[in-house]
Amino acid sequence: FVFLHLNRRNMIAVLGTVVVIVTAIWFASPSLRERTATIFTQYHAYETSNEVTSAGMRLEFWRKSLHFFRDAPLIGHGTGSVRELFVEAAAGQTGVSAEVIANPHNQTLYVAVQWGAVGVIILYAMWLCHLLLFRGATLAHWVGLLVVVQNMTTSIFNSHLFDFHEGWMYVLGVGVAGGIVLAKEASMSSITRQSGNPA
């Protein structure tokens, strides 16, 4: 919204307001500061002692997933291969390195491990096409844009396209909003053609 509809001065004002609000929330919320401190503590425990922590597990999943991707960068290891790869990597390990999962909690890595760079290109092309579809200013455009941006953002820490509820929310959100947008564009195009070719 900021980049599409505001001039430079208003854009700076909006971004400045966001910075002030985020700063105020940071200082007003002890739980936010505590959660952030916990993440850093868990990261330190993972780095120094291979301790099983929430943040440490995610980092370990991502590290191993990048290693799996490097082993098969072009077309990946195949559909459903993630758990088997983690089982093999956990053999003889202790602590967080012994954890086995079927989902690395990152959409890009989940796709990269199974389908390689080809899959990642398709994933990002899909997101880009959907972002471009919702460039207008109607409610349908904004709903569609919100669904896509939310999915892209949360996919940093999860594989929401492949989670049942979140995946269907994306399909329905983009499908319904996209259908409305495309129908409106087709209607406008038809009106333009008719006005250009009077009977």
Question: Model-flagged regions — what are they?
Answer:
Residues V82, F86, H130-F134, T153:
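Hydrophobic alpha-helical interface/terminus motif in multipass membrane transporters
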Residues V20-F27, V148-F157:
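Aromatic-anchored segments of alpha-helical transmembrane domains
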